[in-house]
Curated annotation (Swiss-Prot):
This is Nucleoprotein. Its EC number is 3.1.13.-. Zn(2+) binds at residues 392, 499, 502, 518. The record marks 459 as: Important for exonuclease activity. HAMAP family: ARENA_NCAP. It comes from Lymphocytic choriomeningitis virus (strain Armstrong). Residues 54-237 are annotated as: Binding site for the cap structure m7GTP. The lineage of its organism: Viruses, Riboviria, Orthornavirae, Negarnaviricota, Polyploviricotina. Mn(2+) binds at residues 382, 384, 522.
Length: 558
């Protein structure tokens, strides 16, 4: 590794402390107050149970609910909290160059974190596998002659088998007040002794990163430090573990001075100045987001924490109420607010979707994804909306279970509302973030001379012709309405989870409630009707990723 790409961790920490000293404050009294409240208010038998859960090799939804419930109790007992607040950064206090640098680093950090949560190396998988998949993997490893992962070794696999992995977000951070309360109660040590011990650890942290050897030497003076242990894996360490990192953070928060990063307070009024200072430190020491998967370096750490929440103490506060990740909670708007000359601002809702197509990177991504379409496989197409104003398009290949399914914000909102009542039942508000330009890009990328099946071809033919795709051939199966809808309920029962956009009540001309029309469901319904049976799909997936289908209008989401 070249010197220019060497992470000089403590040197970076010291530089960040110098640059951000005006954003730090004395939080010692507040931390001790919160620790006292936790000592008096927490059920430590439940704390012990959660610590046991965090030692399990496989954890499920019940375990997660137990952790989240205890976290909620902690949240209700403390004053130091970070709140969920979206932060939109525009050119102004931060220059366009600084915003672009910030955007690039957040994107790199996102990629690094996602890789660390789902690494490919055998035996170090950190994502969500079901119990059945884990057992099956063990059998496969034995078949191919690979050893079963050592359960007690470093890099132990601990997996959350949960239905909604987003509920794991922001549930594992350490808090000085919680660390102190657990140390005092569970080691039967007075809180004042814990404060003194951690303060000494914090003083050491002003000149170096404390390690286990330092800890061993300090134990003679402070026996309570004996509860601190080395964590073999940093995967999902909770606030209830006695890790060295948690203890060092607590020590830093207890110092009256030292300009410790742990005492930074971020507010809407100072967030841009704080980020500007962070970027200033980055430039001075050539800090960067490392490609290496693992613990975050000091620059990555402060970047993530500050962008996660727009209000609160990013290092030491309770953040379990925050929704989303750093790249979701910080958005960058690089558009100019200066109106065009002689161009009156349109009334809200009157101009339709923003006239912005795909970016170059999105176009290249779509081109790669569309390469997975089999041009010779039987393929269905269906649309919702008008041919000149479609709001939903689906292309489905039953042989391999793959499909293209996306949405479009309508131009004619009055017509959309009529169609919603009598056909698709979609909510206009749900389409505001649909990616503009996707319809033309997808249709333009379909293989040359492809043959598509449909039930009713007039609107689809007009849509294809409007995109100069007269080479694409249509086969209209021309079933009766009754025959075409025969498998409607069965398809919705089995595959309805694939689309959650049809939320309204739909009535026919006789004002009788009917099932909303979904372009994707209709493709599967027509396939079922034509074969007189439900398709047996081993796998089913949309080749378009969610962040290509949706985006914030005029805003780049990081």
């Amino acid at each position: 590794m070249s010197l220019s790409k060497e992470v000089k961790s403590f040197q970076w920490t010291q530089a960040l402390r110098r640059e951000l000293q005006s954003f730090t404050s004395d939080v010692k009294a507040a931390v001790i107050k919160d620790a006292t409240n936790l000592l008096n208010g927490l059920d430590f038998s439940e704390v012990s149970n959660v610590q046991r859960i965090m030692r399990k090799e496989k954890r499920d939804d019940k375990d997660l609910q137990r952790l989240r419930s205890l976290n909620q109790t902690v949240h209700s007992l403390v004053d130091l909290k970070s709140t969920s607040k979206k932060n939109v950064l525009k050119v102004g206090r931060l220059s366009a160059e600084e915003l672009m640098s910030l955007a690039a680093d957040l994107e790199k950090l996102k990629a690094k974190i996602m890789r660390s949560e789902r690494p490919q190396a055998s035996g170090v998988y950190m994502g969500n596998l079901t119990t059945q998949q884990l057992d099956q993997r063990s059998q496969i490893l034995q078949i191919v002659g690979m050893r079963k992962p050592q359960q007690g070794a470093s890099g132990v696999v601990r997996v959350w088998d949960v239905k909604d992995s987003s509920l794991l977000n922001n549930q594992f951070g350490t808090m000085p007040s919680l660390t102190m309360a657990c140390m005092a109660k569970q080691s039967q040590t007075p809180l004042n002794d814990v404060v003194q011990a951690l303060t000494d650890l914090g003083l050491l942290y002003t000149v170096k990163y404390p390690n286990l050897n330092d800890l061993e030497r300090l134990k003679d003076k402070h026996p309570v430090l004996g509860v601190i242990t080395e964590q073999q894996s940093s995967i999902n360490i909770s606030g209830y573990n006695f890790s060295l990192g948690a203890a060092v953070k607590a020590g830093a928060a207890l110092l009256d001075g030292g300009n410790m990063l742990e005492s930074i307070l971020i507010k809407p009024s100072n967030s841009e100045d704080l980020l500007k200072a962070v970027l200033g430190a980055k430039r001075k020491l050539n800090m960067f987001v490392s490609d290496q998967v693992g613990d975050r370096n000091p620059y990555e750490n402060i970047l993530y924490k500050v962008c996660l929440s727009g209000e609160g103490w990013p290092y030491i506060a309770c953040r379990t109420s925050i929704v989303g990740r750093a790249w979701e909670n910080t958005t960058i708007d690089l558009t100019s607010e200066k109106p065009a000359v002689n161009s009156p601002r349109p009334a809200p809702g009157a101009a339709g979707p923003p006239q912005v197509g795909l970016s170059y990177s999105q176009t290249m991504l779509l081109k790669d994804l569309m390469g997975g379409i089999d041009p010779n496989a039987p393929t269905w197409i269906d649309i919702e909306g008008r041919f000149n104003d479609p709001v939903e398009i689906a292309i489905f290949q039953p042989q391999n279970g793959q499909f293209i399914h996306f949405y479009r914000e309508p131009v004619d909102q009055k017509q959309f509302k009529q169609d919603s009542k009598y056909s698709h039942g979609m909510d206009l508000a749900d389409l505001f973030n649909a990616q503009p330009g996707l319809t033309s890009s997808v249709i333009g990328a379909l293989p040359q001379g492809m043959v598509l099946s449909c039930q009713g071809s007039d609107d689809i033919r007009k849509l294809l012709d409007s995109q100069n795709r007269k080479d694409i051939k249509l086969i209209d199966v021309e079933m009766t309405r009754e025959a075409s809808r025969e498998y409607e309920d069965k398809v919705w029962d089995k595959y309805g989870w694939l689309c959650k956009m049809h939320t309204g009540i739909v009535r026919d001309k006789k004002k009788k409630e009917i099932t909303p029309h979904c372009a994707l469901m209709d493709c599967i319904i027509f396939e079922s009707a034509s074969k007189a049976r439900l398709p047996d799909l081993k796998t089913v997936h949309n080749i378009l990723p969610h962040d290509l289908i949706f985006r914030g209008p005029n805003v780049v989401t990081l």
